[in-house]
């Protein structure tokens, strides 16, 4: 089963000096596990695409399990507000790349 929910995500402005903007995006739900497509910035500044979840599965559960309870949320939108940190033992993509 695959469903999509429309959400808004904060995106950088068109140029460096413009304010950030919210863009419509979709949250993909596959078999009851929600994934949000995000961009992760690595320590060197490189940005890579990443699928993030806080519901379990292969990404983020062991690191983010306590964050939803400690964070704030907007009940009218269901949005979780906070800074999410995750320690990855490899470079990116859940071990698909060798650490630098």
From Swiss-Prot:
Q: Which GO terms describe its molecular function?
A: oxygen evolving activity
Keyword Membrane recorded: yes
Kindly list the GO CC terms recorded for this protein.
chloroplast thylakoid membrane; photosystem II oxygen evolving complex
Asked whether the UniProt record includes Plastid among its keywords, one would answer yes
Instruction: Identify the main location.
Output: plastid
> Which GO terms are recorded in the biological process aspect for this UniProt protein?
photosystem II assembly; photosystem II stabilization
Record protein name field = Oxygen-evolving enhancer protein 1, chloroplastic
Native source organism of the sequence: Populus euphratica
Question: What gene name does this entry carry?
Answer: PSBO
